[in-house]
Amino acid sequence: MNPDTDSPIMPLFIILGKLTDKAVQKMRDAKERDEKAEEIIQAAGGRLISHYYTFGRYDFVATVELPSAEILASVIIDITRWGTVGTETMTALLPEDIYKMAH
């Protein structure tokens, strides 16, 4: 349960992303792309929890809540269609969920 709302928490996903050359060449458009991606997530019934640009193997990391893995796939397809990012995703579980499973 979400302690702030007493509602069930949606599945949590971590998105690791790499920017394409097209995205790097148009970094001035990054804010607009990020806002559009958040709109897509929200329209799918989800929530962007965090988003960071990173240095190293991946160019950005985002954490999102979405109703299902199928909806995540749809969101990723919509976003990668722009040709500006490639992604790798992971399902994330809260420590409390793991503790419950261990009993």
What are these regions (language model features)?
Residues 2-103:
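A compositional/biophysical signature of low hydrophobicity enriched in polar/charged and small residues
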